Amino acid sequence: MKLLSLASLTVVLSSVATTFAAKSFSASNLYYAAGLTDSQQTTLLTGLQSAGVKVLRVWLDGQSGSTKGTPINSFNGLQGTGPDDWDDTVLNRLDNFMAKAHGYGIKLLISIHSYNALEGNRDFYGKYYGTGDFYTNTQAIAQFKQRIAHVLAHKNPKNGKTWAQSSEYIFAFEAQNEAMHPQGNKPALQSWQCTMAKSIKDNLQGNTKILVTTGGGSYVDDSLLDGYFSCSSLDVLAIHAYGTGDLNTSKLKPYVEKAKNAGKKLIMQEWGACYTNAANNNCNGGSPLSTSTRDANIKQWAAAIDASGIPWFYWQILPNPDPHYDWDYEVGINDVNWGALKAAGLAAGQAESAFDFSPYLL
């Protein structure tokens, strides 16, 4: 048997490590996806696929009318005026959508609730408990666990499986978008996140092919509270970041190492490039940036996230031209800045990831 020198062995091992390095991916958000018509779905999914997008994050809040310039089929939120007031329209709509998305190589990340709905009193949680008591009241916690159970037990006629079993369609579940925003009681929030993550895990009934994630905060540091790293039920910690100081490799890298040491994965679940010259984390008003300037911002910040080893979800990619409302981060498919975002999405798929998500992607 011929023995390798230490130097030769090092080269071989390095080559093997490079060969099997996990690849990153790009993803997007569309909170009103359940309202899309079939043709809008086709436009969106075709565009996302062309940009290398592997996951789309969707919400279960009700929406109506024209949303972000998209004339949608209106739908109610999952729950209404009381804990027994269920409307499964949003789930039924997403049954069809997730099956169609599968054909484009895309899975869904399901956000089970949003702080936006809580704060806006769009269902009974806000009306009964408000943003203060919702995270600590024992009855509210029990009722929200029932919501989680209801969602995961929902059966999709497209595959005859519950959502908890539908790993071919679903990438991950999160309890709530930007829970307790702003974070007035961090200990209570950390406890709530872990409690709800365990509830999701329990309702997955041993299915480890679907991930459990948080729903982010308003910036990097408050997206990654210390208690999340020690919660055994959380697989993924989600970052939301719009400030330019947060869209920086040197800011993100220490958290990557912290997550790896804790056995967690990270995703940049929300980020965006403002259409105007307003502050990027307060994208209201201001004058439109030149196409080339915004293109450069998109490419620069996406590359910085890629370099940190974190997959990213853009906020948001639309199936129609961006109408340029307030908080204007959106990019429409085949609209201004689409070429830059599409190129960034494809580049993400070639970047190395600090975390191996390949078992959870199509």
Model region roles, listed by residue range:
Residues 1-21:
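Fungal secretory targeting signals
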Residues 22-234, 243, 261-264, 275, ...:
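Active-site mouth of glycoside hydrolases
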Residues 244-257:
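Substrate-binding surface in catalytic domains of secreted glycosidases
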Residues 268-271:
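Short acidic/histidine-rich active-site segments
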Residues 280, 285-286:
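Gly/Pro-rich active-site loop or hairpin
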